[in-house]
């Protein structure tokens, strides 16, 4: 069974004040999402699921879904503020979208195979999809197997300013033991440093593994998260 690619696109408009992520940047108007999907399909993924908001459903279907639905199975699910687990209610003043796990849980009715989770507006590179697809295929038929594609910190910095990254720690067997978000990382005085809430600077290793929100799960994840 081929793994599924789950694309987190519900927060697109809220982060950029409009669907700028749907603007083309390639020679033929390709978006970052187009490159991600192309790399994923070449790596062996067999289905795409998008999570979006209903407010931009029409535009998203016209610009994105229409390019793929005749070539590969495509599903769309919706992340809305009022879609909450039993026992929870929406505060009337809430405007900000819920977090990543809430978005992932929106797909529990349509994903039944190992799957990858990516951000719609991040570029991950072909090799990342190849590595993750191989791992997900190996996880088929198993339970409680989850993984993350890590990136070398020095390769994820920006020349345009500071970045936020989830700095990871692993044990001797390469199992993820912690992720700490550092919200202001940049190269300063020739070394990579982050600034904490009190404006103190701390050095980070060039090769520190960081998360770019590229994950792999077996489908039992939905059940565990519900609990």
Functional labels for PLM-detected ranges:
Residues 18-19:
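Conserved catalytic-core motifs of eukaryotic protein kinase domains, centered on the activation segment
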Residues 22, 76, 146-148:
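Conserved beta-strand scaffold positions in the cores of enzyme catalytic domains, especially
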Residues 51, 116-119, 147-150, 216:
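A structural signal for short, well-ordered beta-strand segments and their strand-loop junctions
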Residues 211-225:
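Conserved nucleotide-sugar donor-binding
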Residues 12, 122, 153:
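Active-site metal-binding loops of divalent metal-dependent hydrolases
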Residues 1-7, 13, 27-117, 124-125, ...:
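Conserved N-terminal catalytic core of the sugar/cofactor nucleotidyltransferase
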Residues 126-215:
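Conserved core of the sugar-phosphate nucleotidyltransferase
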């Amino acid at each position: 069974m081929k793994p599924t690619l789950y694309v987190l696109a519900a927060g697109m408009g809220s982060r950029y004040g409009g669907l700028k992520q749907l603007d083309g940047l390639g020679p033929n108007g390709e978006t970052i999402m187009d490159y991600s999907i192309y790399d994923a399909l070449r790596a062996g993924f067999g289905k795409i699921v998008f999570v979006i908001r209903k407010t931009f459903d029409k535009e998203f279907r016209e610009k994105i879904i229409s390019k793929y639905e005749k070539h590969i199975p495509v599903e769309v699910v919706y992340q809305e503020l009022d879609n909450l687990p039993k026992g929870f209610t929406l505060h009337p003043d809430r405007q900000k979208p819920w977090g990543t796990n809430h978005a992932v849980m929106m797909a529990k009715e349509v994903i039944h195979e190992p799957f990858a989770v990516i951000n719609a507006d991040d570029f991950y590179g072909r090799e990342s999809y190849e590595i993750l697809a191989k791992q997900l295929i190996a996880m088929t038929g198993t339970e409680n197997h989850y993984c993350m594609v890590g990136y070398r910190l020095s390769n994820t910095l920006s020349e345009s300013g500071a970045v936020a990254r989830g700095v990871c720690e692993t044990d001797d067997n390469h199992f993820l033991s912690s992720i700490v978000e550092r919200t202001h990382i940049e190269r300063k005085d020739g070394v990579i440093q982050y600034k904490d809430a009190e404006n103190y600077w701390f050095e980070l290793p060039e090769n520190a593994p960081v998360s770019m929100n590229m994950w792999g799960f077996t489908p039992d994840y939905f059940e565990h998260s519900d609990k």
